[in-house]
């Protein structure tokens, strides 16, 4: 039997899913790789993998894209790991440096700045350029909030803007996946989520970041109807950028 190739994100927010997959009978049926979000998306788009936990902004670029899990990386309001960090208040932001690791967060920043904050901003991607603000996501944001005079949590700002939760990444396939596998996969993800407290014991303690609050409360992993609505709305805003 051909193994199903899966690319998942290497960040802490995905560890419950990985835990569930690694403690399930699926291990014999899959090839699992851990990547940064942009690489998860690239592998799925290029057909190097069958399923990926991909930044949602990449979904329109995936051939035959279909969401195969009832779980996602999401939040209802503040998420505490997807930020616009700024030297100036948002009304004064003129230049923003984007994050090379995620298309979704860059697009979310653009959508919020244009439609929510009504700011005309120019975007740069090069490290050396000194911008007013930067987009930063994932583990690289842990404990960084105090390094900047202004921090805008994009999950919180999206909620302020739309009244909806947000989906940062979803489990997407680029082909039809057998329903039996999908059922087992969802069970594995649910099991991993149920073991978050145990998982925390194995994670390194961070002085300046509350991992327990992050994994148990800030992140919201169920792909609800409201999150699906938010996803469709977000993709429609990206199309208007």
PLM feature spans:
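Domain-level signature for soluble enzymes in the chorismate/prephenate branch of the shikimate pathway
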Residues: 1-241
């Amino acid at each position: 039997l051909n193994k199903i190739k899966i690319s998942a994100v290497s960040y802490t927010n995905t560890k419950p899913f990985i835990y569930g997959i690694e403690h399930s009978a699926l291990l014999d049926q899959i090839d699992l790789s851990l990547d940064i979000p942009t690489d998860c998306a690239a592998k799925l788009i290029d057909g190097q993998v069958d399923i990926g936990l991909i930044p949602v902004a990449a979904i329109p670029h995936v051939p035959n894209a279909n969401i195969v899990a009832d779980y996602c990386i999401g939040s209802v309001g503040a998420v505490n790991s997807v930020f616009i960090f700024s030297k100036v208040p948002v009304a004064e932001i003129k230049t923003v440096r984007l994050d090379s690791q995620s298309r979704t967060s860059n697009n979310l920043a653009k959508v919020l700045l244009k439609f929510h904050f009504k700011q005309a901003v120019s975007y740069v991607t090069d490290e050396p350029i000194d911008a007013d603000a930067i987009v930063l996501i994932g583990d690289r944001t842990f404990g960084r909030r105090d390094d900047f005079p202004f921090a805008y949590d994009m999950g919180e700002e999206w909620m302020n803007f739309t009244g909806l939760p947000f989906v940062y990444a979803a489990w997407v396939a680029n082909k039809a996946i057998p329903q039996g596998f999908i059922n087992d996969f969802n069970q594995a993800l649910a099991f991993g989520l149920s073991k978050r407290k145990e998982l925390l014991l194995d994670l390194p303690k961070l002085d300046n970041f509350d991992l327990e609050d992050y994994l148990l409360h800030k992140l919201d992993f169920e792909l609800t109807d409201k999150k699906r609505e938010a996803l469709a709305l977000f993709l429609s805003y990206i199309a208007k950028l």
